[in-house]
From Swiss-Prot:
Part of the ABC transporter complex PhnCDE involved in phosphonates import. Responsible for energy coupling to the transport system. It holds the Pfam family ABC_tran. This is Phosphonates import ATP-binding protein PhnC 1. It is an enzyme of class 7 (translocase). Its EC number is 7.3.2.2. It comes from Haloquadratum walsbyi (strain DSM 16790 / HBSQ001).
Length: 304
C-alpha cells in the first residue's frame, strides 16, 4: 500500500479555473519527492490537498490508506513563509508544534510536558540549531528561521513531511543548508517527504524522485537520471518563444550541477534534553536573506 495516494484528483476554483486536472500519484513510505513546475502549475494546491487545507473537487486523497481528513498530526508542514512568533525563542517556536497533537486546553496553555520539551530540543538538534535554542526568532537569518519551521513540524512526530517552496526566498548557500537538514531529518526519522521547489539545481541535489506539474497536469514522474534537460525545457518552456536555458540559469545562479554536502549533525538524541545548548552542532554559516536585527534576548526558555 502506498503511503500517499492521489487518485484522479481535480481541483477547480470557481467554474473556470482548473488548478489540478485528473492527477494520480502514489508515493511509497520513505521517499523524498520533489515537485517541480512553473508558477501557477498547481504545486501548492497539490500540497494543500495532502495537508487537508483544501479538498479536491473530484477524486480521492489518502495517507496511509485513510482519507487526508483523518491524518491529523501525522502530516507536518513547512511553508514558504516561516510564520514564526518572532518575539519567542527558537525553542518556544519549535515547541508550538506540539499543539497539533492535543486538543486538551491545559496542555495547550502550558506546553511544558517533559516529552514535548524533549521533542522540541531533539528537533532543533536535527536541524543544527540546538546551540541557538534560546535565540529570539526575530534575530535569526531567513535560513535559520526556515530550519526552526522544520523543527516545529518535526515536533508533531509526523510520518509525512510536506514543504511548499521552503527555500524560494533564500540565497543558494542558505537554501542548500535548509534542504540538507530536511533531507537528514527525513533519513533519521524515516519520513516520507514531498517538497515543491522551483530551483532545479537544488532540487536535483536532494530529491530521489521528481514529479513535474504544468497547467495542473503531471507531465513527468521519474528519477534524477531521468530528469533530463529536455524534460526541464518541456516543463518550464513548452509553448514559450524564449530560448531554453541551462539548469543553473533556471535557478538564477548560472552554476553547474553539484553534489549535496554530506555534513551531518549529531544523531545521538537520547540525551538531548540534558545537553548544554552551547554544545549543539551547527555545520556551516547561514546567509539567509532575512536580516532582522532585533537584539533583545530570550533567556532561560529551554531549561527543562
Amino acid at each position: 500500500m502506498p503511503h500517499v495516494s492521489l487518485q484522479n484528483v481535480t481541483k477547480l476554483f470557481g467554474e473556470d479555473t482548473i488548478a489540478l486536472d485528473d492527477v494520480s500519484i502514489e508515493i511509497t513510505a520513505g521517499e523524498f519527492v520533489v515537485i517541480l513546475g512553473p508558477s501557477g502549475a498547481g504545486k501548492s494546491t497539490l500540497l494543500r490537498i495532502l495537508n487537508g487545507l483544501t479538498e479536491p473537487t473530484t477524486g480521492t486523497a489518502q495517507i496511509g490508506g485513510s482519507p487526508v481528513s483523518e491524518s491529523g498530526s501525522d502530516v507536518g508542514m513547512v511553508f514558504q513563509m516561516h510564520y514564526l512568533i518572532e518575539s519567542l525563542s527558537a525553542y518556544r517556536n519549535a515547541l508550538t508544534g506540539a499543539l497539533s497533537r492535543t486538543t486538551n486546553l491545559k496542555s495547550i496553555l502550558t506546553l511544558n510536558q517533559t516529552d514535548d520539551k524533549r521533542a522540541a530540543l531533539r528537533a532543533l538538534d536535527t536541524v543544527g540549531l540546538l546551540k541557538d535554542a534560546e535565540q529570539r526568532a526575530g534575530t535569526m537569518s531567513g535560513g535559520q528561521k526556515q530550519r526552526v519551521g522544520i523543527a516545529r513540524a518535526l515536533v508533531q512526530n509526523p510520518s509525512l513531511l510536506l514543504a511548499d517552496e521552503p527555500v524560494s526566498s533564500l540565497d543558494p548557500k542558505a537554501a542548500r543548508d535548509v534542504m540538507r537538514y530536511m533531507k537528514q531529518a527525513a533519513r533519521e526519522r524515516e519520513l516520507t517527504t514531498v517538497a515543491s521547489l522551483h530551483q532545479v539545481n537544488i532540487a536535483r541535489e536532494f530529491g530521489d524522485r521528481f514529479i513535474g506539474v504544468r497547467d495542473g497536469t503531471v507531465i513527468f514522474d521519474g528519477s534524477r537520471a531521468e530528469l533530463s534537460m529536455d524534460v526541464i525545457d518541456d516543463l518550464y518552456y513548452a509553448g514559450s518563444e524564449s530560448t531554453p536555458v541551462s539548469h543553473g540559469d533556471i535557478e538564477g545562479q548560472g552554476e553547474g550541477l553539484t553534489k549535496p554536502d554530506d555534513t551531518s549533525v549529531s544523531s545521538d538524541m537520547e540525551t538531548t534534553s540534558g545537553r548544554d545548548h552551547s554544545t549543539g552542532t551547527d555545520t556551516g554559516t547561514d546567509t539567509g536573506t532575512d536580516t532582522e536585527t532585533d537584539t533583545e534576548t530570550d533567556t532561560g526558555e529551554a531549561q527543562l
